[in-house]
Amino acid sequence: MIIIDTGCANLSSVKFAFDRLNIKAEISRDIATIKSADKLLLPGVGTAMAAMKILQDRNLIETIQNATQPMLGICLGMQLMTEYSSEGNVPTLSLMSGHTDLIPNTGLPLPHMGWNKVRYEQDHPLFAGIEQDSHFYFVHSYAVLPNEHTIATSDYGVPFSAALGCKNFYGVQFHPERSGKNGAQLLKNFVENL
């Protein structure tokens, strides 16, 4: 398992989440290491524009786009998997269709921060052993509205994609590394089931 070094703040907490599961995970930006990994994790905290610049500066965009092994994007990492983000009006990785937009104003404060229910729409291996409507921890102001790649939703005034999946690419808007036993189970499922 390689955690792609995106330079974001949650790298260590993601690695510690795997350590707690006794799953060997290494943080790397080395292209050869990333290409040879059995699984990849794309973490992200911050803005889409800054994250894409870091990926470009580290020559990682093409490597990520050409990955054939299972990859899990977390929070901004999931958003980067789509085609475009209105956060900075930046093209993203285009690993699946869809775009990321500011959560529509429904009178609720932004960012959406805290625990929220997740309802998975399909019997997906990423959610094996996790009860329907389980709570996960979110911190975000931008989201991907439900589309053909949505495998789970949550609601913050409007429904949004809590998880996406397309081919070997998966993403979660919430932070599994901060979501207790449900998050730990999801990370374990990613490693063991995908």
UniProtKB/Swiss-Prot annotation:
One of its GO terms (molecular function) is imidazoleglycerol-phosphate synthase activity. The keyword Transferase does not apply. It catalyses: 5-[(5-phospho-1-deoxy-D-ribulos-1-ylimino)methylamino]-1-(5-phospho-beta-D-ribosyl)imidazole-4-carboxamide + L-glutamine = D-erythro-1-(imidazol-4-yl)glycerol 3-phosphate + 5-amino-1-(5-phospho-beta-D-ribosyl)imidazole-4-carboxamide + L-glutamate + H(+); L-glutamine + H2O = L-glutamate + NH4(+). Residues 1-194 form the Glutamine amidotransferase type-1 domain. It is found in: Cytoplasm. Its EC number is 4.3.2.10, 3.5.1.2. InterPro entries: Class_I_gatase-like, GATASE, Imidazole-glycPsynth_HisH. The active site is at residues 75, 175, 177. Pathway: Amino-acid biosynthesis; L-histidine biosynthesis; L-histidine from 5-phospho-alpha-D-ribose 1-diphosphate: step 5/9. SUPFAM superfamilies: Class I glutamine amidotransferase-like. Pfam families: GATase. This is Imidazole glycerol phosphate synthase subunit HisH.
